[in-house]
Amino acid sequence: MESTISLKVNKGKGKGSKGASSSDDKSKFDVVKEWTNWSLKKAKVVTHYGFIPLVIFVGMNSDPKPHLFQLLSPV
């Protein structure tokens, strides 16, 4: 049994490196897109769980110092 190897040939106009460049650009774009989505998801979680502790921390360090109940009450 003979094994054959098939290679794809770029039949488009222009230089062959142009096709490789566009695929590299697409893969770079995909990597940037994945990193952006990942970082935005992490930022959303940090904001979600960190907002209330941040408000309490800033409120406790303000002058005059309020009680914890006053910080947590909506009024």
Curated annotation (Swiss-Prot):
Annotated region described as Disordered, given as residue ranges: 1-28
Pfam families in the cross-refs: Tom7
GO cellular component terms given for this protein: mitochondrial outer membrane translocase complex
Main location: mitochondrion
InterPro entries noted in UniProt: Tom7 (IPR012621)
UniProtKB keywords: Acetylation, Membrane, Mitochondrion, Mitochondrion outer membrane, Protein transport, Transmembrane, Transmembrane helix, Transport
Cytoplasmic topological domain: 1-46
Residue positions where N-acetylmethionine is found in the record: 1
Gene Ontology biological process: protein import into mitochondrial matrix
Residues in the Mitochondrial intermembrane compartment per record: 65-75
Membrane topology term: Single-pass membrane protein
Subcellular location: Mitochondrion outer membrane
Membrane-spanning parts: 47-64
Tissue spec. comment: Expressed in roots, flowers, young cotyledons and leaves.
Family: Belongs to the Tom7 family.
Subunit-structure text: Forms part of the preprotein translocase complex of the outer mitochondrial membrane (TOM complex) which consists of at least 6 different proteins (TOM5, TOM6, TOM7, TOM20, TOM22/TOM9 and TOM40).
Protein's job: Seems to act as a modulator of the dynamics of the mitochondrial protein transport machinery. Seems to promote the dissociation of subunits of the outer membrane translocase.
UniProt name for this protein: Mitochondrial import receptor subunit TOM7-1
Source organism (scientific name): Arabidopsis thaliana (Mouse-ear cress)
